[in-house]
């Protein structure tokens, strides 16, 4: 028997993604990543051995059944555009499936580009309206997580919400970096503050605060009205978290969606993994998370694959040098096209086409594509940017004063090495 109940969960899970368009905000500079974003937008930064950061939001969309996607770009967009064209052009246009690139165009004024996250959507409203969506899923393109957006859409519809905000608990001392909310027992949002100096703790857990994940579901027509009103507001920063969400909350039209209800896990592990990799230390640590024996984020899950641009590369190779020293790795990710010769790599991530020459020791290090590590180098707790050529005998991560003089060293002691830094030596 066919169930015609419009709130039947199975029917909603099938239908709601087809009625939705996802908009990924991918124009951020990512200044806290320092030199990693000098030539690329933060969502285009390499991650996890073979991915780009934006691949997680894009893969979540596809795996959730959302196949109409807009990617809003602005800062240093060429690398991002090239990646999407090469890796995400397989959707079927005849079935109205697409990944649409939406660059900044100064649509309303030549005096400014995107003034905020809400303005980035507003300036593309003429295009977005033509998608004829019933629901808009607004996503950040710079977070690492696996989430079934169809479950959030179901929650949104069943509550009769105009706006739904995904949320998760974060330590109170870290909450000032997020939008923080208070909710009632039905998860209606009662109060919302963007990056407050004194975050409100959760009533049942005073050491934690309930933080926005920067993921929103809107009824499309309601969102269009909000954006049109906000566009001409002189006192607005034209930002979702700073302006629109507090306004919706004041009208009691916003609901919270706990990440626990839609987080995708695999096996018996039910840990909810979500990372903002906005700082060098967070980026380094999240990469090395994947090199652990049992990572909290499973990128090997065939039921929820993380897709990316595919390169035709030879297998990774580990060889001994002429002296008989064997190339070997332990607890590491090593991508295609890599060659490790007579060196030891421990708890590290090597992206495609990395060459590690003889007598090197590499520990707790993230090496981006096309890097050549000269003989007898020692690398520890560092990030090596793409296409760097490290000279023979270079030591990084052992002398804080020397590292700070030559490269960028974070407060946590993570060292970033870029081509421009090496050229100045």
From Swiss-Prot:
Any GO MF annotation of the entry: glucose-1-phosphate adenylyltransferase activity
Catalytic activity: alpha-D-glucose 1-phosphate + ATP + H(+) = ADP-alpha-D-glucose + diphosphate
GO biological process: glycogen biosynthetic process
The entry's keywords: ATP-binding, Carbohydrate metabolism, Glycogen biosynthesis, Glycogen metabolism, Nucleotide-binding, Nucleotidyltransferase, Transferase
Recorded superkingdom: Bacteria
Binding site for alpha-D-glucose 1-phosphate: 114, 179, 194-195, 212
Pfam families: Hexapep_GlmU, NTP_transferase
The UniProt record lists the keyword Cell membrane: no
Disulfide bonds: none
Pathway in which this enzyme or protein is active: Glycan biosynthesis; glycogen biosynthesis
Enzyme Commission number(s): 2.7.7.27
HAMAP family, alphabetized: GlgC
Assembly behavior: Homotetramer.
NCBIfam families: glgC, PRK00725.1, PRK00844.1
Family: Belongs to the bacterial/plant glucose-1-phosphate adenylyltransferase family.
Main function: Involved in the biosynthesis of ADP-glucose, a building block required for the elongation reactions to produce glycogen. Catalyzes the reaction between ATP and alpha-D-glucose 1-phosphate (G1P) to produce pyrophosphate and ADP-Glc.
Protein name: Glucose-1-phosphate adenylyltransferase
Organism: Pectobacterium atrosepticum (strain SCRI 1043 / ATCC BAA-672) (Erwinia carotovora subsp. atroseptica)
Gene name tied to this protein: glgC
């Amino acid at each position: 028997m066919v169930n015609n109940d419009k709130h039947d969960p199975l029917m909603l899970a099938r239908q709601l993604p087809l009625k939705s368009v996802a908009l990924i905000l991918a124009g951020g500079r990512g200044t806290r990543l320092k030199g990693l974003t000098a030539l690329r937008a933060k969502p285009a930064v390499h991650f996890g051995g073979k991915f780009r950061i934006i691949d997680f939001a894009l893969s979540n969309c596809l795996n959730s059944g959302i196949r109409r996607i807009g990617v809003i770009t602005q800062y240093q967009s060429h690398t991002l555009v090239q990646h999407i064209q090469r890796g995400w052009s397989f959707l079927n246009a005849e079935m109205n499936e697409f990944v649409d690139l939406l660059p900044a165009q100064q649509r309303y004024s030549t005096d400014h580009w995107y003034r905020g996250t809400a303005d980035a959507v507003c300036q593309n409203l003429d295009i977005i309206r033509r998608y004829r969506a019933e629901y808009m899923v607004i996503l950040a393109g710079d977070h690492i997580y696996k989430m079934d957006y169809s479950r959030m859409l179901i929650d949104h519809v069943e509550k009769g919400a105009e706006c739904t905000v995904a949320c998760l608990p974060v330590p109170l001392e870290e909450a000032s970096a997020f939008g923080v909310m208070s909710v009632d027992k039905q998860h209606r949002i009662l109060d919302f503050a963007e990056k407050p100096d004194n975050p409100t703790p959760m009533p049942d857990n005073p050491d934690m605060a309930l933080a926005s994940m920067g993921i929103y579901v809107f009824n499309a027509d309601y969102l269009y009205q909000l954006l049109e009103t906000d566009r001409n507001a002189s006192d607005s920063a034209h930002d979702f978290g700073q302006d629109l969400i507090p306004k919706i909350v004041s009208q009691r039209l916003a609901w919270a969606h706990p990440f626990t209800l839609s987080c995708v896990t695999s096996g018996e592990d039910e840990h909810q993994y979500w990372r903002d990799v906005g700082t060098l230390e967070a980026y380094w640590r999240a990469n090395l998370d994947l090199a652990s024996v049992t990572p909290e984020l499973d990128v090997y899950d065939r039921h929820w694959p993380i897709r990316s641009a595919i390169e035709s590369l030879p297998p990774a190779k580990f060889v001994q040098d002429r002296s008989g020293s064997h190339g070997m790795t332990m607890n590491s990710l090593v991508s295609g096209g890599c060659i490790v010769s007579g060196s030891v790599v421990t708890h590290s991530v090597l992206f495609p086409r990395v060459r590690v020459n003889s007598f090197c020791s590499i520990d707790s290090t993230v090496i981006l594509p096309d890097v050549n590590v000269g003989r007898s180098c020692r690398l520890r707790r560092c990030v090596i940017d793409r296409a760097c050529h490290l000279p023979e005998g270079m030591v990084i991560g052992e002398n804080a004063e020397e590292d700070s003089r030559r490269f960028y060293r974070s407060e946590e002691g993570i060292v970033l090495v870029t081509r421009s830094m090496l050229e100045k030596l």
